[in-house]
Amino acid sequence: MKKTVYTKAGQVGLVEVERPQIEAPDDVILRIVRTCVCGSDLWSYRNPEIEAGHQNSGHEAIGIVEEIGEAITTVKPGDFVIAPFTHGCGECDACRAGYDGTCDRHIGTNWSDGVQAEYMRFEYANWALVKIPGQPSDYTEAMLKSFLTLADVMPTGYHAARVAHVKRGDKVVVIGDGAVGQCAVIAAKMRGASQIVLMSRHEDRQQMALEFGATAVVAERGEDGIAKVREILGGGADAALECVGTAAAVDQALGVLHNGGRLGFVGVPHYNNRALGSTFAQNISVAGGAASVTTYDKQFLLKAVLDGDINPGRVFTHSYSLDEIDQAYKDMNERKTIKAMIVIE
């Protein structure tokens, strides 16, 4: 099968590898029909020390069940499914508490890896896979795009709002205008926020966020950005949703909150461990981590997409074939597309 690997910093390519095999009783082999490039993939893509042939970090997919392990009872060959980027077991303390993004049965992260390919092996599939009614041919391309967001970015945006306890009437600020930030805007609106300010410098992304439910955008950064947000909100925010993963983004998020505010962070951290002593005087609550993808999809996000209540698939502004994967990365890196979808026929 074809699989994407890094060839050098700033370049990816396809190689031929063996198809994955069932390795555990609760494994499933999927034939991928749609995958994509995530903003977090670009951290490795830009790494000057990346090794040629290093497996990429593509981790979002929807596909068809090809083969199942002997313990699988919830799906069968031919089923159409969302492959969450996390693989919760559904039975441990973390999963039962609704935090399957950090399942206790995994060492390190429980994320998918290398799914910019024709097939993938999905672990803990009996609980973690999310079945979609019907087949891909039953849906429009727009709907398939929205299903694909349910593998990561829509649940991740929702997770930021959930752990920040966004509730009806809240004033919310979203830091980050990529796909996760856009989905955080959707999530804040779903949870009843009265004002949603997106911090963004890019006109196309500003417009998308306004259409998703943002009530204002702020292009300024640093102290100027904080002052502008506070002017718009008439004070600090009740909740800030950090969707970037840099120290500057965290500082911005903390700066826009009023005393007693709440920070939800879902940007994968690319900074040294940050001391939280600075939040002491503000009584700031801080929470975040990998999203509870399976939990959110099964409880309400898949239904919201099927019912037409949300349309997060709009974040996929360009589509590519698997053979065009290098161009997809380049366009993401150069901000020519908000999120690149890969179509595999």
Feature locations, PLM:
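C-terminal hydrophobic helical "lid"/dimerization subdomain
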Residues: 3, 235, 247, 251-255, ...
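Glycine-rich beta-strand-centered segment in the early N-terminal region that forms part
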Residues: 20-35, 48-96, 113, 133-140
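Short, well-ordered coil/turn residues at beta-beta hairpins
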Residues: 84, 241-243, 344
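Rossmann-fold dehydrogenase core element
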Residues: 262, 274-314
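Glycine-rich cofactor phosphate-binding loops and adjacent beta1-alpha1 units
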Residues: 164-168, 191, 203, 207-287, ...
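Mid-domain Rossmann-like dinucleotide-binding core that forms the NAD(H)/NADP(H) cofactor-binding site
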Residues: 138-223, 227, 239
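NAD(P)H dinucleotide-binding glycine-rich loop of Rossmann-like/cofactor-binding domains
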Residues: 89-175
